[in-house]
């Protein structure tokens, strides 16, 4: 919600000054956004057109939430209670793309078997943000990835019954349960 509000409030000012608004600078946000850009540049170079669909996958993590990320997520949840209409913005993968409405996007909100990788994947807690950022980048680059571009981002849990059990457990967990306070974390060791 707040990123959408800030784009509406400051987007024109940023454009006029030549500035760029960068909201998400976490361990995942920039690598996924730049990873899609790098991949699409390579696909265009090799095939003359962009890939119409890209799937981002998290293989593993050994970091922790920053207090700022946790506070942003908590504030978003609190804002939803006061303004239920924000849910439409949060659920829209194109909410940061200046009014663009793209194609229906792949499901990323429940565990599933990724048949190409032959592994179970679970919802990645930052995917709702990262997906919006990637679609915004596409829009800001005049839809270099295409108007029909689809993206989803999930967390690899592993193959077989153990992978399915892990995917089910991750999808039912609360990522904010042990979150640090704003201004705290991640620790030096985990960075």
PLM features: residue spans?
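Rossmann-fold NAD(P)-binding glycine/threonine-rich loop
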Residues: 1-19
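C-terminal catalytic/substrate-binding lobe primarily of soluble NAD(P)-dependent oxidoreductases
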Residues: 15-18, 29-30, 41-191
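Active-site nucleophile and cofactor-binding loops and adjacent substrate-binding regions
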Residues: 23-29
């Amino acid at each position: 919600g707040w990123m959408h509000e800030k784009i509406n409030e400051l987007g024109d000012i940023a454009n006029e000054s030549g500035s760029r608004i960068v909201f998400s600078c976490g361990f995942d946000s920039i690598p996924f956004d730049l990873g899609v850009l790098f991949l699409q540049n390579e696909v265009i170079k090799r095939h003359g057109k962009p890939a119409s669909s890209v799937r981002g996958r998290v293989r593993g993590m050994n970091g922790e939430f920053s207090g700022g990320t946790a506070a942003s997520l908590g504030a978003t949840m609190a804002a939803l209670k006061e303004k239920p209409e924000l849910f439409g913005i949060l659920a829209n993968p194109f909410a940061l793309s200046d009014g663009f409405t793209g194609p229906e996007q792949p499901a990323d909100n429940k565990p599933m078997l990724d048949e190409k990788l032959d592994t179970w994947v679970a919802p990645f807690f930052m995917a709702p943000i990262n997906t919006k950022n990637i679609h915004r980048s596409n829009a800001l680059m005049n839809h270099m990835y295409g108007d029909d571009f689809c993206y989803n981002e999930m967390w690899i849990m592993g193959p077989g019954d153990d992978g399915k059990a892990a995917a089910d457990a991750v999808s039912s967990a609360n990522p904010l349960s042990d979150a640090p306070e704003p201004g705290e974390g991640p620790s030096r060791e985990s960075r």
